[in-house]
Amino acid sequence: MVNYFIISISFFLLEHFYSFYLNFRQSKLLKNLTKVPEYCKDRITQEDFKKSQEYSKAKLDYKTLTSTIQVLTTLLSFYYPVYPYFWNLSLELAEKIGYPNEIIRSCFFFAFTVGVSVITEIPFSYYYQFILEEKFGYNRMTRTLFIKDKIISTLLMIGFGLPILSLAIFIINWSGPQLWFYCWLLLVAITLLSITIYPTFIQPLFNKFTPVDGELAESIFALAKRVGFPASKDTIFVVDNSKRDGHMNAYFYGLFGTKRIVLYDTLVNELDKEELLAVMGHEFGHYKMSHTLKQMLLVQVHLVTLLYAFSLLINDDQLYQQFGFVSSKDSVLVGLTLFMFLYSPIDRIFSLLINIFSRKYEFQADDFAVELGFLNSNHLFKLHFKELGCLVYDPLYSAYHHSHPTLVERSNNIDKKVALYKLKNK
């Protein structure tokens, strides 16, 4: 007999203990680093460096604390059968309203688990936003906006989650052994639909998007024309992130006819035109090399693997009984919830692989910007320092957690590409 319960708990603890070990390595590195690293000693003052170290340490301590609490609450939820309790309560409610079928019962179960997750997360996100971020001058969010965001995001989660869940349960019960294939088709359809509706209907609920204009717009459109990006007032936007915090970012997303580049207003206000164009050159690099599509394909491989493995275990009564449920006839949603605990090591492996490709894509986008004639990394340093970004990372910690290369890795890569560019264009 396979003891799924012991395997799941062991994997869960192993993953978190390794994460704690990496946090310890990173914390020790930060503690021992008292002087500005050589690669940026002429770019940052000792005072700003010290503040950066304090911010990095505060975030790391926060991460360690929240992970510790997550481990304890998860173990307690297994020791005291919280999930079976919610499942039985869901049946009672479904019977009271006269619809004790699996879909209605699963919708109640989903609502309970989402509700508990949202409520227990609020103190941590509040602390992070209004204490940690406030301490270092980044918080600009009001408590009213904080509450509004939580309400809207929860309603969206339930509003979209319940219909998708109901459809998924129907498909799984209908499709039998081929459930992995039909569920994958459903997820592909949902992904493509979300890419279409997210920028138009979802994002405006949280932020205001203004088309880029003026001299900056003319320069960006000229650069876009050089690289073949279909730029217009409907594809490049400035978002009012400053109403939430002082952080800066730019990102490209979308496929087919929904391609967009978004610049934070904090970024536009902080960088000069040439630096902003260098940022745009990087984002255009993601577009030209189809990084969004490639990442989406990687995610599909992950999903197919997950769904196929789930199809092999969904009818195994041992999986359910070892976690306090009656049998595999309980629910598709219960089976998926339990399976995700068991699947966590494979999920982590895929996350690491996706990080490897993501880091590679960042280097490629930087290379593309160099080929456009942006021959330094000043904008990266400026952004990093304004963000009080960590200046040194333990290599194991970075490889495990980061989807982007570190500042020194990107800077060194750009310097090498600039040298080659200058040789080629003498």
Swiss-Prot record:
Catalyzed reaction equations: Hydrolyzes the peptide bond -P2-(S-farnesyl or geranylgeranyl)C-P1'-P2'-P3'-COOH where P1' and P2' are amino acids with aliphatic side chains and P3' is any C-terminal residue
Main location per the UniProt record: endoplasmic reticulum
E.C. number: 3.4.24.84
Broad class of enzyme this protein falls into: hydrolase
GO molecular function: metal ion binding; metalloendopeptidase activity
Ranges that cross the membrane: 4-24, 71-91, 107-127, 151-171, 179-199, 295-315, 334-354
Bilayer topology annotation: Multi-pass membrane protein
Pfam family, one: Peptidase_M48
Binding site for Zn(2+): H282, H286, E362
Cellular compartments per GO CC: endoplasmic reticulum membrane
Cofactor binding note of this UniProt entry: Binds 1 zinc ion per subunit.
Cross-referenced InterPro entries: CAXX_Prtase_1, Peptidase_M48, Peptidase_M48_N
Cytoplasmic side: 25-70, 128-150, 200-294, 355-426
Keywords of the record: Endoplasmic reticulum, Hydrolase, Membrane, Metal-binding, Metalloprotease, Protease, Transmembrane, Transmembrane helix, Zinc
UniProt GO BP: CAAX-box protein processing
Catalytic residues identified in the record: E283
Residues in compartment: Lumenal: 1-3, 92-106, 172-178, 316-333
Cell compartment(s), UniProt: Endoplasmic reticulum membrane
Cofactor(s) needed for function: Zn(2+)
Known function: Proteolytically removes the C-terminal three residues of farnesylated proteins.
Stated family: Belongs to the peptidase M48B family.
Protein's recorded name: CAAX prenyl protease 1 homolog
Organism encoding this protein: Dictyostelium discoideum (Social amoeba)
